Swiss-Prot record:
The keyword Oxidoreductase appears for this protein: yes
InterPro entries attached to this UniProt entry: Met_Sox_Rdtase_MsrA_dom (IPR002569), Met_Sox_Rdtase_MsrA_sf (IPR036509), Met_Sox_Rdtase_MsrB (IPR028427), Met_Sox_Rdtase_MsrB_dom (IPR002579), Mss4-like_sf (IPR011057)
Protein name (Swiss-Prot/TrEMBL): Peptide methionine sulfoxide reductase MsrA/MsrB
Keyword list, A-Z: Multifunctional enzyme, Oxidoreductase
Reactions it catalyzes: L-methionyl-[protein] + [thioredoxin]-disulfide + H2O = L-methionyl-(S)-S-oxide-[protein] + [thioredoxin]-dithiol; [thioredoxin]-disulfide + L-methionine + H2O = L-methionine (S)-S-oxide + [thioredoxin]-dithiol; L-methionyl-[protein] + [thioredoxin]-disulfide + H2O = L-methionyl-(R)-S-oxide-[protein] + [thioredoxin]-dithiol
Region (Peptide methionine sulfoxide reductase A) location: 36-189
EC number: 1.8.4.11, 1.8.4.12
Residue stretches in coiled coil: none
Xref: HAMAP family: MsrA (MF_01401)
Pfam name, any one: PMSR
Biological source species: Helicobacter pylori (strain J99 / ATCC 700824)
Chain ranges of the MsrB domain: 206-329
One GO CC annotation: cytoplasm
Length: 359
């Protein structure tokens, strides 16, 4: 019996070792239990890897070759093995969903181009989404259906279970970190254009709003009133953080885009994302203006004018403090706005550098 027990343990050890060796050889190590992995092909992997590493919620990104005909390959043999240059993305699902991660991916690829991205042409530069979790297939399919409605032409993104993955040579790993200014077909700044989910926020009923808001907040957001200049909460606030819709909590503006226009109301050069605000013509007060409203709450925020600083884009979003709630940078994570912290920090650093140059 002892011999039989020993043999069972021995064969189990061999089996586990074989599985680990197989996973290692294909570059598909399983992430930790609280992490997820997806493999994305989008042209030259140098740029896509650097881009993915900039996205909040991504734990690690590395370059490799996916879904070829053979279990081994290298950069010189890709035309023979038919692997796609791909990026292995390990991410934290508590911080970013697969759906949102794919939307960031879609921002930097041409989804209808066949075997070509940027200046790179060939099968190795095809687009593809390769999954190891079968449950991801439905998420991927739904994301592609939504994308198809937005683009002209048939989507050419390959979707398959991962197979024959090989980690790329060390020379290719973190290439743009090793070679700043090296070739990259992707605009890495697009990672800083934060995506704000529209299904994460809802507009309360009018009854709830009347209980939740102060009289001034209600009159401003629901009846398009204007608060007094220089006598409002945020017109001269300089603290780092995010400004959200007082009615829904949807992120609207960043302290990094706030500046002193001298008008007496909070002024911003742009919203945190172009989709979070809507515009309507306003001909009240016998003059033409452009009203700014929140996307989900449809709350009146203020107006936008074209007399802003040219170096900031030339716009002045003149917004009522009563339409906003400010969340300090130190509280953003615990209040569920952690994904916007990198945007705030990068923007504040850029603003600091610009201020130094101007003085």
């Amino acid at each position: 019996m002892k011999i039989l027990s020993y043999l069972k343990k021995f064969y189990l050890f061999l089996l586990i070792g074989a599985i680990m060796q197989a996973n290692e050889s294909m570059g598909a190590k399983l992430p930790k239990t609280d992490e997820r992995v997806i493999y994305l092909a989008g042209g030259c992997f140098w740029g896509l890897e650097a881009y993915m590493e900039r996205i909040y919620g991504v734990i690690d990104a590395s370059s490799g070759y996916a879904n070829g005909k053979t279990s081994s390959t290298n950069y010189e043999k890709l035309h023979e093995s038919d692997h796609a240059e791909s990026v292995k993305v390990i991410y934290d699902p508590k911080k970013i969903s697969l759906d949102k991660l794919l939307r960031y991916y879609f921002k930097v690829i041409d989804p209808v181009s066949v075997n070509k991205q940027g200046n790179d042409v060939g099968r190795q530069y095809r687009t593809g989404i390769y999954y190891v979790n079968s449950a991801d297939k439905e998420v991927i399919d739904n994301a592609l259906k939504a994308l198809q409605k937005e683009v002209k032409g048939k989507i050419a993104i390959e979707v398959e279970p991962l197979k024959n993955y090989v980690r790329a040579e060390e020379y290719h790993q973190d290439y743009l970190k090793k070679h700043p200014g090296g070739y990259c077909h992707i605009d890495l700044k697009k990672a800083d254009e934060v995506i704000v989910d529209d299904d994460k926020y809802t507009k309360p009923s009018d009854e709830v709003l009347k209980k939740k808001l102060t009289k001034l907040q209600y009159e401003v957001t629901q009846n398009k009133h204007t608060e007094k200049p220089f006598e409002n909460e945020y017109y001269n606030k300089e603290e780092e953080g995010i400004y959200v819709d007082i009615t829904t909590g949807e992120p609207l503006f960043s302290s990094a885009d706030k500046y002193d226009s001298g008008c007496g109301w909070p002024s911003f050069s742009k919203p945190i994302n172009k989709d979070v605000v809507k515009y309507e013509d306003d001909e009240s007060l016998n003059r033409k203006r452009i009203e700014v409203l929140s996307r989900i709450g449809k709350a009146h925020l203020g107006h936008v004018f074209n007399d802003g600083p040219k170096e900031l884009g030339g716009l002045r979003y003149c917004i009522n403090s009563a339409a906003l709630r400010f969340i300090p940078l130190k509280d953003m994570e615990k209040e569920g706005y952690g994904e916007f912290i990198p945007y705030i920090k990068k923007g504040e650093l850029k603003k600091y550098i610009q201020d130094k140059k101007s003085h």
